[in-house]
Design a protein with these regions (language model features):
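Short, surface-exposed polybasic/aromatic micro-patch for ligand or macromolecular engagement
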Residues: 2-58, 285
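Conserved tyrosine-mediated DNA breakage-rejoining catalytic core shared by Y-recombinases
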Residues: 7, 192, 225-307, 318
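Short regulatory "switch" loops immediately downstream of catalytic or recognition motifs
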Residues: 16-19, 113-136, 231-234, 244-257, ...
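Short, Lys/Arg-enriched alpha-helical recognition elements, typified by the DNA-recognition helix
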Residues: 57-163, 177
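Phosphate-coordinating loops and pocket residues in cytosolic domains that bind phosphorylated ligands
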Residues: 66, 105-108, 120, 169, ...
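Short, basic (Lys/Arg/His-rich) helix/loop patches that form interaction surfaces
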Residues: 123-127, 141, 198, 202-205, ...
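Basic, Lys/Arg- and aromatic-enriched nucleic-acid-binding interface segment
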Residues: 127-129, 133-145, 149-151, 164-227, ...
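Extended amphipathic secondary-structure runs
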Residues: 151-167, 184-187, 285-319
């Protein structure tokens, strides 16, 4: 039960509750009038009885996010790059502005103001949580709407966990995400593609660009291809190539925090003391694993490339 005490010109409601560790604590809330105190006495007794009382907690936004990220990463089996990117968002786009604020004091209005601040924030203002000195040109290059929407999506998920953990009764995240204007990427037409290929003299670069143009492969997917991924006899001799892995450079710290089953191989360091590693990993999503058809010119170039590799291996063995 709660009680009301008069303290000078104000009235205090005193009550007992159990914190997250099960310890019995005493709560005090002050009001200017006796009527306000009486109303709060009734409401807090009801909350304590039906389990809707919000246990006071001084956890900050930064503390909550750094508690949430390893749980989210493990639960959804994040790739190292996803982990690194999310940590960077927290360090550089959230903590400098909201990090010290207690989550129980965050209001929807605070977040709307936060998004407005981000829209006026130059890209790269913070790196690893440290404020950078920018040039005049860099100061005019602001965060994109897509970046702010990404921050919104992350906070929406993180604050939903805070509700599940009993730190909040409801999430303060605004219902509508910040607006984002998408910019269409300029894509080469067929004539430009052919002209580019015809001017390339480096065979490695030529094959990589040819694969990218015809099959729409990402750089990491091209670098992750192996001879066994190619079936020249499939599709009635047309030939296919199967995408099933990707080569990527990632921070070693992220590798320690993410699912090891996402990684096929970690390559040895080329430089001693490097903070990152080159890894061969599973594709970004299940849909990223796919089988694609070859064109005749691409098939011929792949055959020639593999034959050259075979000849090079024979030459090395003969030494």
């Amino acid at each position: 039960m709660a009680s009301i005490l008069r303290r000078g010109d104000s009235y205090s409601v005193r009550f007992k509750y159990k914190d997250h560790a099960g310890r019995i604590c005493e709560g005090w809330e002050s009001f200017k009038t006796k009527k306000e105190a009486q109303d709060r006495k009734i409401s807090v007794e009801k909350e304590l009885l039906d389990g809707t009382f919000l246990i006071p907690d001084a956890m900050t936004v930064a503390e909550m996010l750094y508690k949430w990220i390893p749980i989210q990463s493990s639960k959804h089996k994040w790739a190292p790059k996803t982990y690194t990117h999310t940590v960077a968002m927290i360090q550089n786009l959230v903590v400098p502005y909201l990090g010290k604020k207690q989550i129980q004091k965050v209001q929807t209005y605070d977040l709307e103001q936060f998004y407005a601040t981000l829209s006026r924030t130059p890209r790269g203002l913070y790196k690893q949580g440290v404020k950078q000195t920018l040039t005049d040109k860099q100061k005019r290059q602001f965060l994109t709407g897509a970046s702010i929407r990404e921050v919104h999506a992350m906070l929406k998920t993180a604050f939903s966990y805070a509700v599940e953990w009993g730190l909040l009764l409801k999430s303060p995240i605004p219902r509508e995400a910040p607006k984002s204007t998408s910019e269409e990427r300029a894509i080469w037409d067929e004539k430009t593609m052919l002209a580019a290929l015809q001017t390339m003299t480096d065979p490695t670069l030529h094959l990589a660009v040819h694969l990218s143009m015809i099959l729409s492969l990402r750089v990491g997917e091209i670098l992750g291809l192996q001879p066994g991924d190619i079936n020249f006899d499939a599709a009635d001799g047309r030939g296919t190539i199967t995408v099933g892995r990707s080569l990527q450079r990632t921070e070693k710290a992220a590798l320690e925090k993410t699912d090891p089953n996402q990684i096929y191989h970690i390559f040895p360091d080329q430089r001693e003391g490097s903070s990152s590693a080159l890894v061969l990993k599973k594709p970004k999503t299940k849909k990223s694993s796919r089988t694609l058809y070859l064109t005749k010119p691409l098939k011929e170039e792949l055959l020639a490339w593999l034959e050259k590799l075979r000849q090079d291996e024979l030459a090395m063995d003969g030494r």
